[in-house]
C-alpha cells in the first residue's frame, strides 16, 4: 500500500513529549480510572460508544472492531489482560517499530487498515473523503478532539493537499507521524487536546 506522503521514520521513544503523549492516551482509554487498561475497555469505547453514536452499520462496526483489536494487539494487549502504563508504552514501541518498517516497504499498516475502516463510517456522503463537519462529529463523539478549535487544528494539519477535504492517506500519514515518531510535520495534530 503506497503513500504519496513521506513521514519521519526515526523513532524518539525516550523523548518526554512522546511519553507524555502516550500517557495522555492511556489515561483517556482507562475508562474505569484504575490505572490499568484492557482491550475490553478499548473495544467497548470504540464499538459500543463511538461506532454506535456515529450510527455505524453492524458491518461497519464489526470491521472497525477487527481493526481496533488488531491494532491494540500489536501493542501487546488482549481481552481480559490488564496492563499498566509501562507495559502500554513498551507495546507502543513494538507497534511503532513494526508499523514503520511496513510503511518504509509500502506494505499495509494496522493504522492504515483502521483508517480505512473508520473513514467508511465518517464519510457519510460516500465521497471517499471527509469534511470538516464529519471530522467534528467524530471529535465530539470520541472525546479525542472535544473542542471545535481542536477539530479544526487536526483538520488543517491533515489536509496536506489543501483540498478542503481529508483522504485516508493524509490522515494516516499525520497520525503515523504524531503517534509513532514525533514527526514535526504532525506536531499539534489534536490542537490542545493531546500533548
UniProtKB/Swiss-Prot annotation:
Residues 1-6 form a propeptide. It holds the Pfam family EF-hand_7. GO terms for biological process: bioluminescence. This is Obelin. It comes from Obelia longissima. Keywords: Calcium, Luminescence, Metal-binding, Photoprotein, Repeat. Ca(2+) 1 binds at residues 30, 32, 34, 36, 41. Belongs to the aequorin family. Ca(2+) 3 binds at residues 159, 161, 163, 165, 170. Residues 17-52, 53-88, 110-145, 146-181 form the EF-hand domain. Ca(2+)-dependent bioluminescence photoprotein. Displays an emission peak at 470 nm (blue light). Trace amounts of calcium ion trigger the intramolecular oxidation of the chromophore, coelenterazine into coelenteramide and CO(2) with the concomitant emission of light. Ca(2+) 2 binds at residues 123, 125, 127, 129, 134. GO terms for molecular function: calcium ion binding. InterPro entries: Centrin_CML-like, EF-hand-dom_pair, EF_Hand_1_Ca_BS, EF_hand_dom. It comes from the Eukaryota.
Amino acid at each position: 500500500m503506497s503513500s504519496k506522503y513521506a513521514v519521519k521514520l526515526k523513532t524518539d521513544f525516550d523523548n518526554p513529549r512522546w511519553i507524555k503523549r502516550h500517557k495522555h492516551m492511556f489515561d483517556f482509554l482507562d475508562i474505569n480510572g484504575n490505572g490499568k487498561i484492557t482491550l475490553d475497555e478499548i473495544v467497548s469505547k470504540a464499538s459500543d460508544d463511538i461506532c454506535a453514536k456515529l450510527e455505524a452499520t453492524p458491518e461497519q462496526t464489526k470491521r472497525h472492531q477487527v481493526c481496533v483489536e488488531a491494532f491494540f494487539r500489536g501493542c501487546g494487549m488482549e481481552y481480559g489482560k490488564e496492563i499498566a502504563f509501562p507495559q502500554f508504552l513498551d507495546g507502543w514501541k513494538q507497534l511503532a517499530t513494526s508499523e514503520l518498517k511496513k510503511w518504509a516497504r509500502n506494505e499495509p499498516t494496522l493504522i492504515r487498515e483502521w483508517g480505512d475502516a473508520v473513514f467508511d463510517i465518517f464519510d457519510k456522503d460516500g465521497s471517499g473523503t471527509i469534511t470538516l463537519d464529519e471530522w467534528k462529529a467524530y471529535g465530539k463523539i470520541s472525546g479525542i478532539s472535544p473542542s471545535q478549535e481542536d477539530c479544526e487544528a487536526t483538520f488543517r494539519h491533515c489536509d496536506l493537499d489543501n483540498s478542503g477535504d481529508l483522504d485516508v492517506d493524509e490522515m494516516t500519514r499525520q497520525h503515523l507521524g504524531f503517534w509513532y515518531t514525533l514527526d514535526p510535520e504532525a506536531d499539534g495534530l489534536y490542537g490542545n487536546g493531546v500533548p
